[in-house]
């Protein structure tokens, strides 16, 4: 199977996984990226089974609306039953690196507000140690130099992501050459740097379930 076929398979698996949760008042959190887009397309086939969605980016909100799926502001809903999103990397503890699509802050907020976080990915994203994929850090623009210097002290090699402005009006530093042996500790350390909005480690609030598309089929990993 190609990577695109694996992504399609895991999007279908995610829809099958969450379908028993769907009721007339259910709110579904929806992530951002190529795999999340395929999940949105699957979700559209069942849009009569639930109330609506909360999206983690303007791009996902636009795709949902094109399918006729209601998109609510997070502040207008009481709870999110389940959040489905992809990842750039996952370890065996379901700690993730996310943010390749620059939506990490809103993704982290939606994940924090959700009863269950279902991560969907293909087998290439499962690693023993996080850090091969550069860690995105969303920053206040004026703090870029300061944050970069602090990230170097942590052992990383930060690179400014040229031409990218997040939905929140901020910039992204991608941090290379990190061997992330303690994801929770590093997430806290980076978030403690003045000028950082958040970073792409989802370790404090990790995924609850990882649906992993492999050439042998879908594997389900749980915490």
Swiss-Prot record:
It catalyses: aldehydo-D-ribose 5-phosphate = D-ribulose 5-phosphate. Its EC number is 5.3.1.6. One of its GO terms (biological process) is pentose-phosphate shunt, non-oxidative branch. GO terms for cellular component: cytosol. Keywords: Isomerase. Homodimer. This is Ribose-5-phosphate isomerase A.
């Amino acid at each position: 199977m190609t990577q695109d076929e694996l992504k399609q398979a895991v999007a279908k698996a995610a829809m099958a996984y969450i379908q028993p949760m769907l009721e007339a008042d259910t709110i579904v959190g929806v992530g951002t990226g190529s795999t999340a887009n395929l999940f949105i397309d699957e979700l559209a086939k069942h849009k009569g089974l639930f109330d609506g969605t909360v999206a983690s980016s303007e791009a996902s909100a636009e795709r949902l609306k094109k399918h006729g799926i209601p998109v609510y502001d997070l502040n207008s809903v009481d709870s999110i039953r389940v959040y489905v999103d992809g990842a750039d990397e996952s370890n065996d503890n379901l700690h993730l690196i996310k943010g390749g699509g620059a939506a990490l802050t809103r993704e982290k907020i939606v994940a924090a507000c959700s009863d269950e976080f279902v991560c969907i990915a293909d087998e290439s994203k499962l690693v023993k140690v996080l850090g091969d994929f550069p860690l995105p850090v969303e920053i206040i623009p004026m703090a870029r130099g300061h944050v970069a210097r602090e990230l170097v002290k942590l052992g990383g090699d930060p690179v400014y992501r040229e031409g990218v402005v997040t939905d929140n009006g901020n910039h992204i530093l991608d941090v290379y050459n990190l061997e992330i042996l303690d994801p929770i500790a590093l997430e806290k350390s980076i978030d403690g740097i003045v000028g950082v909005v958040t970073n792409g480690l989802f370790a404090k609030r990790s995924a609850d379930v990882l649906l992993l598309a492999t050439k042998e089929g879908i594997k389900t990993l749980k915490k």
